[in-house]
Regions:
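FIC/Doc superfamily catalytic core
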Residues: 1-339
Length: 339
C-alpha cells in the first residue's frame, strides 16, 4: 500500500496562481465575520437556498435526480422518498444538515466518516451504509465509441481501512502543526480519499460532504451560504478533468495534485465573491425593483428567475416576478420561452 504523509506538502514550491488564490480567499475569510453580522434573517434565507442547491447538485453530478418540486419538498422534509434516487437525496440532505449543525463535533477519523456514510444511506434498502467496500471497484471511462475502459484502479478492499486511517492521522497531525495552509491540505486529503474510493457507492458525494466539513472546521463557512456543490456541478467537465490529471500515477506516489488544488481554490473563491455580492445587495435600502435591476446588471449571459431570487433573498418571489416583468417591458431584458 502506498504511504500517506502530508508533511511533504510543506516543502512544495507552489506557483503564483495558487499563492494568489490562497491570498484572496484569506482576505475574504477576514471579512467573513462582517458579512455574517448583516441581517441574520436574510442570511438564513441564503442558508435555506444553499442547502437545497447543494443537495440537488451533488446528487445530480452522480446522475441521481428528481424534479425541482420534489427536491424542495424533500429538503423541507414535507414528503418521504418515493424511489431509490429520492432515498439517496434524502440521505444527503441529512448528512449535510448534520455537518451544518455539528461540524465542530465531527473529528476527522475513520469511525466518523463511516457514520457520515451511514447517514447518507439511512433511507436505502441496499445495506451498504457505514461500511467500507467489500469488492474491488474501478473508476471507468466511456470512450466516444461507447467502449468502457478502466481509467483508474483504487486500493483493494483489504487495504481500505488502513488507508483511511492513514490519511486521517496525517491530516490531523499536519492540521495540529499549523505548518500547512488548510486550503492546500484539504484538497490533498480529498484527492487521496477519492483515489482510495473506500465505499461500494457514494464516494463522490462523500468527498463533497467531507470538503464542506473540512472547510467549516478550518473556519471557511462560505459553503453554508453559497452552494459549493452547485458551482462544481456547473463546471463538472473541469472538475473531472482536474481529478483525472491529479490522480494520474497516484498508485506510484508520483501524482501531481496541483490541478485539483487550483480547481478547488477557484471554486471556493468564486463562492466568496458571490457571498459578498449577495450580502452587499442585502445591506442596501433599495426597493425591490432596484435590487432586481442590480442583480440583473451583475449577471452575465442568460439567467432564470431562480437565479435572480438567489441573488436577492430579501425580495419575495412575487416581487421578483413583477420586477422582471417591468424590466422586460422597459426593454432592459429579453424573455426566452415560458416561465
Amino acid at each position: 500500500m502506498r504511504s500517506f504523509d502530508y508533511k511533504k506538502l510543506k516543502d512544495v514550491k507552489w506557483d503564483s496562481e495558487i499563492l494568489g488564490l490562497v491570498a484572496q480567499i484569506h482576505e475574504y475569510k477576514g471579512k467573513q465575520s462582517l458579512f455574517l453580522k448583516q441581517k441574520p434573517a436574510t442570511l438564513e434565507k441564503l442558508v435555506d437556498i444553499a442547502k437545497i442547491q447543494s443537495t440537488e447538485a451533488s446528487n445530480k453530478i452522480e446522475g441521481i435526480v428528481t424534479t425541482a418540486t420534489r427536491i424542495k419538498q424533500l429538503c423541507d422534509q414535507k414528503t418521504t422518498p418515493r424511489n431509490r434516487d429520492e432515498e439517496e437525496i434524502s440521505g444527503y440532505r441529512d448528512a449535510l444538515a448534520l455537518i451544518h449543525e455539528s461540524y465542530e463535533y465531527i473529528p476527522i477519523k475513520s469511525s466518523y466518516i463511516l457514520q457520515l456514510h451511514q447517514v447518507l444511506y439511512r433511507y436505502s434498502q441496499r445495506g451498504i451504509g457505514g461500511r467500507f467496500k467489500n469488492t474491488q471497484n474501478y473508476i471507468a471511462e466511456i470512450k466516444e465509441n461507447g467502449e468502457q475502459i478502466v481509467r483508474f484502479m483504487p486500493l483493494d478492499p483489504f487495504e481500505t481501512p488502513m488507508a483511511i486511517d492513514a490519511i486521517c492521522e496525517s491530516f490531523n497531525r499536519e492540521t495540529d502543526s499549523c505548518e500547512i495552509d488548510p486550503l492546500i491540505l484539504i484538497p490533498a486529503f480529498i484527492i487521496d480519499f477519492l483515489c482510495i474510493h473506500p465505499f461500494n457507492d457514494g464516494n463522490g458525494r462523500m468527498s463533497r460532504l467531507l470538503t464542506t466539513l473540512l472547510l467549516y472546521r478550518a473556519g471557511y463557512v462560505v459553503g453554508k451560504y453559497v452552494s459549493l456543490e452547485s458551482k462544481i456541478e456547473k463546471t463538472k467537465a473541469s472538475y473531472y478533468e482536474t481529478l483525472e490529471k491529479s490522480d494520474m500515477n497516484w498508485n506510484n506516489e508520483e501524482n501531481d495534485i496541483t490541478p485539483f488544488i487550483k480547481y478547488m481554490l477557484g471554486t471556493i473563491l468564486a463562492a466568496y465573491r458571490d457571498f459578498e455580492e449577495r450580502v452587499t445587495l442585502v445591506e442596501g435600502k433599495s426597493s425591490a425593483i432596484d435590487l432586481v435591476r442590480n442583480a440583473v446588471n451583475n449577471t452575465i449571459g442568460k439567467f432564470t428567475k431562480s437565479d435572480i431570487m438567489e441573488l436577492v433573498p430579501s425580495v419575495g418571489k412575487t416581487s421578483v416576478e413583477n420586477s422582471l416583468k417591468t424590466l422586460t417591458r422597459e426593454g432592459v431584458i429579453g424573455r426566452e420561452g415560458k416561465g
